[in-house]
Amino acid sequence: MNLISIPALQDNYIWLLSNKANRCVIVDPGEASPVLNALDQNALLPEAILLTHHHNDHVGGVSEILNHYPNLPVFGPKETAKCGATYLVEEGNTVSLLNSEFSVIEVPGHTSGHIAYYNAPFLFCGDTLFSAGCGRIFEGTPKQMYESIQKIAELPDDTVVCCAHEYTLSNLRFSNDIWPEDPDIESYLHKISQIREKSQSSLPTTLGLERRINLFLRCHEIDLKRKISNEPENIENWQVFKMLRSKKDCF
C-alpha cells in the first residue's frame, strides 16, 4: 500500500491510500480540487471515500468529487448521512476495499458519532488523535474521548497514525509547557520545529512514538498526575485527561 497526504484548507490533510493496481481510497476530503489533482498526478482511480465525521473540513469536497466519479461509494458514520455518505457503518463493521479490509472503530468525543478506520498498519482517525495531542471535545464528554483514545492505544506500536490536521508543533509546545523536563517531548519539539520551518509535514506519526510524546496517551503516569493535580494518588486517569484537555483549550 502507498500512502499520500494531501494538504488542504488551512491545516487539514486529506489521505489517499492506494494499492499496486493504482486504485485508492480517499479519506476525509474537506475540499475537492487538491484530491482531483492528486488523483490525476498519480494516475489513481478512486474506489471509495471514507468519512470519519460530519464536520465540513472533512466532507466539504464530497459532492464535487462525486460529480467526477458519480458511482463512487461513500462510507461514513450515521452523522454523515446528510454529507454524502451512501453506506453507513459502525463499530464492528469491516469495509472491503483495495482487496483488503478496513475495520471500523467508534471513537466518539470530538463528535458523537466519530469513527476511525484501521487497515493494519494504517489508522485513519480524523480529529480524535493528533500527534502530541487530541481533538477538541465538541459533542461528546471528556470520559468518552478518553475511552476512545484508549481504544486506539490498544493498537500495535507500528500503527501508522494518519491524523487530519497539522497541529503537531502547537501540541508539543503545550506538552513542553506542562512537562518541560521530559526529554522525549523536548527532543521532538526541537525536531518538529525544524521540520515546520521548512514547511514540511510532521505526519503521519506512529503509535509507538505517540506513547512517548503524547500526554493524552500518558494519563496513567503518576508523574503526569503530579504535574496537574494536588491529589495525584486519588485522581482517575480520565480525570487527568479532562484536566489536560481543559488546559489545552486555554493554551
From Swiss-Prot:
Q: Does the keyword Zinc apply?
A: yes
Q: Name one GO molecular function term.
A: hydroxyacylglutathione hydrolase activity
SMART domains tied to this protein: Lactamase_B (SM00849)
Disulfide partners: none
Q: Identify the residues that bind Zn(2+) 1.
A: H53, H55, H110, D127
InterPro entries recorded for this chain? Clx_II_MBL, Glyoxalase_II_hydrolase, HAGH_C, Hydroxyacylglutathione_Hdrlase, Metallo-B-lactamas, RibonucZ/Hydroxyglut_hydro
Q: Which cofactor does it need?
A: Zn(2+)
Q: In which pathway does it act?
A: Secondary metabolite metabolism; methylglyoxal degradation; (R)-lactate from methylglyoxal: step 2/2
Name a single GO biological process. methylglyoxal catabolic process to D-lactate via S-lactoyl-glutathione
The Enzyme Commission number assigned here is 3.1.2.6
Q: Does the keyword Hydrolase apply?
A: yes
Any single Pfam family the record assigns to this protein: HAGH_C
Which residues does the record give as Zn(2+) 2 binding sites? Answer: D57, H58, D127, H165
Q: Which UniProt keywords apply?
A: Hydrolase, Metal-binding, Zinc
Cofactor binding description: Binds 2 Zn(2+) ions per subunit.
Complex formation: Monomer.
**Matching PANTHER family:** HYDROXYACYLGLUTATHIONE HYDROLASE, HYDROXYACYLGLUTATHIONE HYDROLASE GLOB
- Please report which protein family the annotation says this sequence is part of: Belongs to the metallo-beta-lactamase superfamily. Glyoxalase II family.
User: What is this protein's function?
Assistant: Thiolesterase that catalyzes the hydrolysis of S-D-lactoyl-glutathione to form glutathione and D-lactic acid.
Q: What is this protein called?
A: Hydroxyacylglutathione hydrolase
Q: Which organism is it from?
A: Pectobacterium atrosepticum (strain SCRI 1043 / ATCC BAA-672)
